[in-house]
């Protein structure tokens, strides 16, 4: 998820075309010769009219009759006034109410309003915690519509929550065609939930976290399961390259390309007569690529996050060995480069910024910006030290980066200004708020935690267990933010979900 800095607009007076000077009761010019007036006064009037015109007009023909004072009149063609674009809030709202989509200046004004809203929204957000019951750690989330968010958890639960009523609807997970009976209950959970560009398909993990599951929207009927010749370990990341092509990254160090055939949709809504379960196809990847082994840490090349650039048709990935990888993504994947990241500990999140053609990588203490067009990092990394707990979720919209930390807070960074957004305050209620110099930080609530885990694993009396914010997603049309997470410590069972609006 480029806006140029807004420039000063000319005033209405500057946009209008001045008319030739002269008395208002002046008689209109005629074609016949006129004998009144002197030559000098006539010349002065011509000079004055030429000097006050904003742009040169057609030459005024002069007809002369006889000698001496006899001369023709100058024909001045009156220029039509240009329409004035009034860039005011009142005119904008009037035009929008009347459906004036093509009104001059409205498109640019709407862009300025959106940019201003993105910049000012964080300081206006207020939290309402959602109740999720005993679910453990929300790892992934996406808005389905204005009221519903679909989430995946560490306890391998896929559910939809209504942010107005807190109602939870669980979604059945798809099972492999040949279940692995030797594999115990999954301890990985669902790390990725992604919608295709048209929001008609949802990709996530299956009951086996090694498999890719695709559901149809808005019904959430199962479409297909990628469990054939695919990943051998947990899926950590998913990205859509088009409406029918998805790519997944796994802990086994591979990236897989999946083609979802639209013909599957009709068959997926049929039902088994005996089991009462929906039918879905079982598919294989069309291409698989292995992450190259690093010389420094060859055993830890797990793919942790993916991001797709639709503009460049390129796929970026980060692996836990501290490398960033880039592929050209067409019908297959062709690797372009692999480079060592400047901050290589706990690289667990990645996003692409269309506004600046940048990849942003979250690590233990920094967010690094990669501009691959320049072959260098020309935007300094931002430091997000929050108790050493690292960056756990990351998103970019226009020029604002939202950072979810492992210490229960949200930070906001302006790429244009290359600084964090600041709190705004006023000396008294009658004054306009101004930046205070303090970093704007939204601190999330306590959520829910299993008290039995506290008694078994931690010292009694310790109450400060902030939630790691593993996921967040915006609903920009309604200016809402969903945030999910849970305790950072692996031995603690709990969850956090909040609606910020």
Swiss-Prot record:
Q: Where is the signal peptide?
A: none
One short Pfam name that applies is: Beta-prop_DCAF12
Q: What are the UniProt keywords, alphabetically? A: Repeat, WD repeat
- Answer yes or no on keyword Coiled coil: no
Membrane spanning residue stretches: none
WD repeat intervals: 185-225, 230-268, 298-337, 384-423
Stretch list, region Disordered? 1-67
Q: Where is the composition biased (Polar residues)?
A: 1-37
* Family from the record: Belongs to the WD repeat DCAF12 family.
Q: What is this protein called?
A: DDB1- and CUL4-associated factor 12-like protein 1
Query: Gene encoding this chain?
Result: Dcaf12l1
């Amino acid at each position: 998820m480029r806006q140029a800095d807004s420039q000063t607009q000319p005033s209405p007076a500057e946009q209008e075309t001045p008319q030739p000077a002269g008395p208002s009761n002046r008689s209109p010019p005629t074609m016949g010769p006129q004998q009144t007036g002197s030559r000098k006064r006539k010349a002065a009037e011509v000079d004055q009219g030429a000097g006050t015109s904003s742009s040169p007009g057609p030459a005024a023909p002069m007809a002369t009759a006889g000698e001496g004072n006899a001369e023709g009149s100058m024909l001045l063609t009156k220029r039509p006034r240009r329409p004035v674009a009034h860039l005011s809030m009142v005119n904008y709202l009037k035009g929008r109410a009347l459906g004036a989509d093509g009104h001059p200046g409205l498109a640019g004004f709407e862009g300025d309003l959106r940019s201003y809203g993105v910049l000012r929204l964080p300081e206006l957000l207020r939290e309402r915690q959602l109740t999720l019951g005993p679910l453990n750690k929300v790892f992934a989330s996406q808005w389905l519509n204005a009221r519903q968010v679909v989430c995946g958890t560490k306890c391998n639960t896929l559910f939809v929550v209504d942010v107005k009523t807190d109602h939870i609807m669980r979604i059945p997970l798809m099972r492999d065609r040949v279940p692995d009976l030797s594999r115990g209950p999954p301890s990985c959970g669902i790390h990725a939930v992604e919608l295709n560009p048209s929001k008609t398909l949802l990709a996530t993990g299956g009951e086996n976290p090694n498999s890719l599951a695709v559901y149809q929207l808005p019904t959430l009927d199962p479409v297909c399961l990628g469990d054939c010749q695919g990943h051998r370990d947990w899926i950590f990341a998913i990205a859509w390259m088009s409406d029918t092509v998805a790519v997944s990254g796994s802990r086994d160090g591979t990236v897989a390309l999946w083609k979802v055939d639209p013909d599957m949709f009709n068959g997926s809504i049929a039902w088994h007569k005996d089991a009462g379960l929906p039918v879905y196809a079982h598919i294989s990847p069309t291409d698989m690529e292995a992450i190259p082994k690093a010389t420094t840490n060859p055993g830890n090349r797990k793919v942790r996050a993916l991001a797709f650039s639709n503009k460049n048709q390129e796929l970026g990935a980060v692996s836990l060995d501290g490398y960033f990888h880039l592929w050209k993504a067409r019908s297959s994947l062709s690797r372009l480069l692999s480079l060592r990241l400047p901050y290589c500990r706990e690289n667990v999140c990645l996003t692409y910024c269309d506004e600046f053609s940048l990849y942003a990588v979250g690590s233990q203490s920094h967010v690094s910006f990669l501009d691959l067009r320049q072959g260098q990092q020309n935007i300094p990394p931002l430091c997000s030290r929050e108790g050493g707990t690292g960056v756990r979720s990351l998103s970019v919209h226009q020029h604002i980066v939202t950072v979810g930390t492992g210490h229960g807070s949200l930070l906001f960074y302006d790429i244009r200004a290359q600084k964090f957004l600041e709190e705004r305050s006023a000396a008294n209620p009658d004054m306009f708020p101004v930046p205070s110099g303090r970093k704007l930080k939204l601190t999330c609530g306590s959520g829910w935690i299993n008290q039995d885990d506290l008694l078994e694993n931690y010292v009694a009396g310790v109450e400060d267990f902030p939630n790691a914010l593993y996921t967040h997603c915006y609903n920009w049309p309604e200016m809402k933010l969903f945030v999910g997470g849970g305790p950072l410590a692996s031995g603690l069972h709990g969850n956090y979900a909040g609606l910020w609006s």
